[in-house]
Amino acid sequence: MATHFPTNPWGKPMSTTDDTLMKRALVALNIAVMTVSDSRTEETDKSGQLLVSRLTATGHLLAEKAIVPDDIYQIRAVASRWIADPQVHIIITTGGTGLTGRDGTPEAISPLLDKRIEGFGEIFRALSFEEIRTSSLQSRALAGVANGTYIFCLPGSTGACRTAWDSLLREQLDYRTRPCNLVDLMPRLHET
């Protein structure tokens, strides 16, 4: 199955050496958002709404949005469908990363990952520590790559989603960010 990688606004593979990168338009990525919750609805899903608002305001495209119960198999099924879709570049989940019995997002997503992005969880918890102090140790936020698709698993709180997007994801999902970003790596994620 062919994977469609983002290109620059002129339809060519993204350049990492062009001095005019920041003058170019953002390369819009297709981002799917999954809210993991037994109780949220479209009307009450503030964290999912925040992520959609932030990603579209930045210039990215919403590929799909879903609210999925706290069930590892349902989470895994939706994530697997998106991972298999070459038009979905990024998956962001919100919810289910805590320590309670129903929190199973890491258990659902981890087996699907080809590689983990350890730095994401580490930096996210460091940023969260500045806001919520030692409560940040309860977060099991994680990120990784599966079939060339980036997956970011965030806590369910709106504040955590805001921190993750504003402080990490917005820059790393912009190919103009230097010295490096995750988008530049996308064409090489399938190398063997």
Task: Outline where the language-model segments fall.
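Non-catalytic beta/alpha edge segments that cap or flank active sites
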Residues: 2-192
